[in-house]
Amino acid sequence: LLFSPDGERFIFLHRWRPDLKTGWKTRMLTAKPDGSEIHVVADHDMVSHFIWKNPKQILAWSREPEIGDRFFLYTDQSDEKEIIGEGFFKVDGHCTYSPDGEWVCSDTYPGKDNLHHLYLYRPRDIAHFELGRFFQPGEVRGKPNRCDLHPGWSRDGKRLCIDSMMSGTRQLYLVDVSELTG
């Protein structure tokens, strides 16, 4: 459950399992705080991480027929959508918009090399950067005590805060992006 920046609507996921032989299916919906004006935003069996860009638009890693799995920017209460980061964001991640709405940051789950990747992307001109690779000990891979990066912006848009176990224990780290974001 995530409220829009103006508090007028919220996102929620509806997850179900048709039978025990298949995986979970997920769709994303929005509604007013009183539960009225429900709108199905994405209904093609898979939605993962999501964030409000502004009171009307939602970025989500989801599936669309004929396209596949991508980050899509959906306009709430409409059928409008656009792909964000085509060819750059290739896997699901914890996505977040900068306070000014100009930049998207996302992480990845660790690969076989036990490295999380942290990416920054500006849709306006397709500027994109890998900000770093962060080690996660193999013994926590896929376990409840794993540590995803979960990037979050400082209010001034000059730094990102991430969770990481790159030093051997779970810590918070600041990543200075001011030279990129202005």
Where are these regions (language model features)?
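Conserved beta-propeller blade repeats
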Residues: 1-11, 38-61, 88-107, 137-155
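Beta-propeller blade-edge and WD-like acidic-aromatic loop motif
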Residues: 13-41, 56-58, 63-83, 109-136, ...
